[in-house]
């Protein structure tokens, strides 16, 4: 059957969201292709660098009066034509004019475009516009609220693949591509590991978990006044940090949350929780306290268990062998033996921890008490149930803290190793270029200068040594060094800004990305940056980050930011991530009115 003759799909089966997306795409296509699309330029800020003025002169033509509007095709007849034909004009009904779009271009958006690309914000140069925005969104989107269904931690290997497989400009050399990859890796370390105070980074989440665990232990200590029996008070006292640190080289009074990273502290906390279950649990679920990961239990002895205990008897939390989805190289692990969980609760906790260590679920809760475990244990009297609940939450948080610390350490060392490899690769590239010039005997002054330059680059790169203690300082030195390499320094930021502004204001299509949830996310993030502005993460700003990932620094929350302060894009950006557009049939004012300087299919440029 001929595809042209096939009937269109029935409209009732199309979802409203898909229909809205198609309408939005068709509207964008009309804006790009319509030669009568006009643009109104709004001066809402200063133009200190003359970029906005030069952009308007290059790509827009002002319309000052009706004669210019007629020449641009916006109007049909001038006032002189109307006056000359006034006596012979017949009374005919006024024609119905089609409506054409008017796009509003704000000067502030043009100014803020400097930091709306990976080149301007992170100094990652040489990428095409589409790849540049993808890399920029991966780094700038770290503080966004996570989607509980689709969020995954981005690891260094996946991010480097994104940059390595990206499309580069045709004039970019191999050395410039390697420099861009190294700069992107260094910025990834800063954005995801060293920025302690920004929501969405692993170190910020680790600090918040340490603070939450301290609060849980403080509340558990406060329950001692509810118990009069010395045996019960002693059982709860064994679960507190002071007792768990006894005999260890770290003390809770001096090291505070740093003791949570100690393996012996974790083992003692699990043993104390096991004893607490054995003494306080009345439903029978706490009698079998784990350690048996093979799932072999007596299937006939369920008479003393509660219905929830029977349902979860064969699906213990500690039985499953889990792996982090984006860090499987860290190996398998088991969760602690937490009781009073149904089969659904066990599956939910295991899935949340293996997916993102509970980050997405934690970011959706309002109270830290309800971290991952369900509230309302009814297996004992309220006093005992509350004490078991606090101790169970603390033990589960301890396991996640240790897993998160291990992933942070691995990411940090892996990035340092990759950056050191990039530096060595650059040294080999420049040595190879110098060898080619030497074989050609450097016959003229230009070749001799090039040979001297390559030798200077090799000498400077040999002094770049990335370490854990001086990462930020070394990275700043590396950024300063690559500014002296012509292959990287000559990549123009102005051209990248022009391509971005031409695309977002519907003048010329700069990239044709398929409509996916990821591209919609990039579009919203881009317009948030264009409207509100941003600051470049360059050598002047990087020294404010600390290179130390010590236990004391990872657990330090004295000067932390608010617990949950994600980057809110605002309802206006979420609802309409694009320029303001209105449709008009008549032009009454010519103030601030512009049209494209080049029309579609004319010499000098194309709108599509």
Swiss-Prot record:
Biased composition (Basic and acidic residues): 18-33
Main location: host cell
Annotated region (Disordered), positions in chain: 1-33
Regions of compositional bias (Pro residues) in chain numbering: 1-13
InterPro entries recorded: UL27-like_protein_herpesevirus (IPR010302)
Source species, domain of life: Viruses
Entry GO CC: host cell nucleolus
Keyword Cell membrane: no
Keyword set, alphabetical order: Host nucleus
Pfam families reported in the protein's UniProt record: Herpes_U5 (PF05999)
Subcellular location field: Host nucleus; Host nucleus, Host nucleolus
Family membership: Belongs to the herpesviridae U4 family.
Assembly, per entry: Interacts with host KAT5, PSME3 and EP400.
Task performed by this protein: Promotes a cell cycle arrest in G0/G1 by inducing the proteasomal degradation of host histone acetyltransferase KAT5/Tip60.
Protein name stated in the entry: Protein UL27
Origin organism lineage: Viruses, Duplodnaviria, Heunggongvirae, Peploviricota, Herviviricetes
Encoding gene (name): UL27
């Amino acid at each position: 059957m001929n595809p042209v003759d096939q009937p269109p799909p029935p409209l009732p089966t199309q979802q409203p969201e898909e229909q809205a997306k198609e309408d939005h795409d068709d509207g964008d296509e009309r804006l790009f292709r319509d030669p009568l699309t006009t643009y109104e330029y709004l001066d809402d800020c200063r133009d200190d660098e003359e970029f906005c003025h030069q952009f308007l002169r290059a790509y827009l033509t002002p319309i000052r009066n009706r004669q210019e509007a007629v020449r641009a095709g916006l109007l049909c007849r001038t006032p002189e034509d109307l006056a000359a034909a006034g006596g012979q004009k017949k009374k005919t009904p006024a024609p119905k004019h089609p409506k054409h779009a008017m796009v509003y271009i704000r000067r502030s958006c043009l100014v803020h475009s400097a930091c709306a690309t990976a080149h301007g914000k992170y100094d990652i140069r040489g990428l095409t516009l589409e790849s540049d925005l993808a890399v920029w969104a991966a780094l700038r989107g770290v503080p966004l609220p996570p989607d509980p269904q689709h969020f995954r931690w981005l690891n260094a290997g996946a991010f480097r693949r994104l940059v390595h497989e990206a499309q580069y400009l045709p004039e970019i050399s191999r050395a410039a591509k390697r420099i861009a990859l190294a700069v992107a890796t260094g910025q990834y370390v800063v954005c995801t590991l060293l920025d302690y105070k920004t929501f969405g980074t692993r170190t910020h989440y680790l600090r918040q978990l340490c603070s939450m665990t301290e609060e849980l232990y403080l509340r558990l200590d406060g329950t001692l006044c509810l118990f009069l029996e010395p045996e019960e008070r002693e059982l709860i006292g064994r679960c507190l940090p002071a007792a768990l640190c006894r005999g260890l080289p770290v003390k809770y009074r001096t090291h505070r949350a740093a003791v949570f990273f100690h393996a012996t502290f974790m083992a003692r906390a699990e043993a104390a929780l096991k004893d607490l279950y054995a003494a306080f649990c009345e439903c029978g679920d706490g009698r079998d306290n784990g350690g048996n990961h093979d799932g072999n239990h007596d299937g006939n002895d369920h008479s003393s268990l509660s219905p929830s205990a029977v349902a979860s008897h064969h699906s213990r939390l500690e039985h499953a062998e889990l792996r982090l989805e984006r860090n499987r190289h860290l190996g398998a692990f088991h969760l602690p033996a937490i009781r009073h969980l149904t089969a659904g609760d066990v599956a939910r906790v295991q899935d949340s921890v293996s997916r993102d260590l509970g980050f997405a679920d934690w970011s959706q809760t309002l109270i830290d008490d309800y971290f991952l475990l369900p509230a309302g244990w009814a297996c004992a009297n309220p006093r005992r149930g509350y004490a078991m609940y606090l101790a169970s939450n603390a033990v589960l948080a301890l396991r996640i803290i240790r897993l998160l610390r291990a992933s942070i350490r691995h990411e940090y060392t892996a990035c340092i190793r990759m950056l050191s490899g990039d530096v060595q690769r650059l040294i080999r590239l420049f040595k190879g270029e110098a060898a080619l010039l030497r074989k050609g005997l450097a016959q003229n002054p230009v070749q001799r200068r090039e040979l001297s330059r390559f030798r200077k680059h090799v000498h400077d790169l040999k002094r770049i040594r990335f370490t854990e203690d001086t990462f930020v300082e070394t990275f700043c030195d590396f950024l300063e060094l690559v500014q002296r390499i012509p292959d990287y320094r000559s990549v123009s930021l102005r051209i990248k800004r022009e391509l971005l502004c031409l695309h977002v204001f519907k003048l010329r299509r700069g990239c044709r990305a398929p409509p996916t949830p990821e591209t919609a996310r990039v579009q919203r993030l881009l317009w948030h940056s264009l409207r509100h502005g941003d600051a470049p993460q360059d050598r002047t700003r990087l020294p404010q980050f600390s290179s130390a990932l010590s236990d004391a620094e990872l657990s330090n929350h004295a000067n932390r930011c608010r617990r949950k302060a994600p980057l809110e894009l605002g309802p206006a950006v979420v609802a309409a991530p694009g320029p303001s557009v209105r449709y008009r049939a008549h032009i009454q004012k010519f103030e601030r009115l512009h049209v494209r300087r080049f029309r579609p299919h004319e010499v000098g440029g194309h709108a599509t």
